Amino acid sequence: MADLKRTQPLARDAMAYVLAGGRGSRLKELTDRRAKPAVYFGGKTRIIDFALSNALNSGIRRLGVATQYKAHSLIRHLQRGWNFLRPERNESFDILPASQRVSETQWYEGTADAVYQNIDIIEAYGPEYMVILAGDHIYKMDYEMMLRQHVDANADVTVGCLEVPRMEATGFGVMHVDAKDNIIAFVEKPADPPGIPGNPDFALASMGIYVFKTKFLMEQLRRDAAEPGSSRDFGKDIIPYIVQHGKAIAHRFTKSCVRSTAENEAYWRDVGTVDAYWEANIDLTDITPELDLYDRDWPIWTYAELKPPAKFVHDEDGRRGSAVSSLVSGDCIVSGATLKKSLIFTGARINSYSTLEEVVMLPDVHVGRNAKLKRVVIDHGVRIPEGLVVGEDPALDAKRFRVSEKGICLITQDMINKLGL
């Protein structure tokens, strides 16, 4: 019987708990009205869909999402797109906003507190394992592989880790490991990150993914909640304590990342800045992008609105509706405009004689005639006035719009309104 249990998927005995309450302030105005996990990505999905899809594709059928900052857009998306799990099949999907369940504190105080405040719900479901996930990264990963390593090693916690160049790891929590990937120390954003044994130019950076046995995690959360000096955070409190007093191991992302081909690199992106967000979206327009959204074996689930197909109209010199090396979603009408290497979400209306190059356009944007836009991100519902030119004069752009370190313009409706056009 023990041998039979070893061959059965561990994911069916696990609950995935997604931490989705963060603002993501480095995305500037893109998160003024929505939490970072609710930000649109890839022409059809939201950022949170990747963590949830990984859980579902891995075989996990109990999902929870903790929300906090400006959660309406996120909650509405989850209600529409993730309501197909059924209790009668031993499945569940719970949206868990901060609600003063165990204290009179209105907000979740930290990532660990976001789990602790819902401890009664978790214990009622009774999963054997907990998979704690960050809801704001873009990647494809089979959590079953990480669960299996956790059980085989009889670990107290298993931490998902990325191999990154050592001097790029200063912005992460970094694992100091031995030759068997046992975690010796956990260092938060170190100035001099410890290297990997045998590969000293690289470091193991935390992905914000943790696997625990549920009973052990509940014990740690209750212990931490009783500590008056704790910040109630996994990275700052829970994980360092277990490293010091228990058994913590590192799980390398390369062991469980989902690739379309064996030659593909392990793809993981933190799209936490305007530059990173724009670049990750525009990368999808490549002939063979690193992130394969067309993989039928590992689909990214989301809310799919009932929309008509995209339409391209007019076929005259200088007024030809066309798109080259671009992704154009449903319910878009490209009317005599030219798109190059751009990603367009649903509901766009792009009018004649306009040219768009390397543009990321969120849903329901209207572009007037004769507009010229290059290297921009356009927020949801913006009305681009006729004849607007962006991307040719950096000094002028900086006076009117948000311009990133790498020269990407972020355009919102409030910025357009101030132009007085």
Swiss-Prot record:
The record's EC number reads 2.7.7.27
Q: Does the keyword Metal-binding apply?
A: no
Name the SUPFAM superfamilies for this protein. Answer: Nucleotide-diphospho-sugar transferases (SSF53448), Trimeric LpxA-like enzymes (SSF51161)
InterPro entries the record matches: ADP-Glc_PPase, ADP_Glu_pyroP_CS, GlgC_bac, GlmU/GlgC-like_hexapep, NTP_transferase_dom, Nucleotide-diphossugar_trans, Trimer_LpxA-like_sf
Instruction: Report which reactions are catalysed by this protein.
Output: alpha-D-glucose 1-phosphate + ATP + H(+) = ADP-alpha-D-glucose + diphosphate
Q: Where does alpha-D-glucose 1-phosphate bind?
A: 108, 173, 188-189, 206
Which keywords are on file for this protein? ATP-binding, Carbohydrate metabolism, Glycogen biosynthesis, Glycogen metabolism, Nucleotide-binding, Nucleotidyltransferase, Transferase
Q: What Pfam families would the database entry show?
A: Hexapep_GlmU (PF24894), NTP_transferase (PF00483)
Gene Ontology biological process = glycogen biosynthetic process
| CDD domains in the record | ADP_Glucose_PP (cd02508), LbH_G1P_AT_C (cd04651)
Residues spanning the signal sequence:
none
The metabolic or biological pathway listed in the UniProt record of this protein is:
Glycan biosynthesis; glycogen biosynthesis
Q: Name one GO molecular function term.
A: ATP binding
Q: How does it assemble?
A: Homotetramer.
Tell me, in a sentence or two, what this protein's role is: Involved in the biosynthesis of ADP-glucose, a building block required for the elongation reactions to produce glycogen. Catalyzes the reaction between ATP and alpha-D-glucose 1-phosphate (G1P) to produce pyrophosphate and ADP-Glc.
Report the family membership: Belongs to the bacterial/plant glucose-1-phosphate adenylyltransferase family.
Entry protein name: Glucose-1-phosphate adenylyltransferase
Origin organism is: Mesorhizobium japonicum (strain LMG 29417 / CECT 9101 / MAFF 303099)
Q: Tell me the lineage of the source organism.
A: Bacteria, Pseudomonadati, Pseudomonadota, Alphaproteobacteria, Hyphomicrobiales
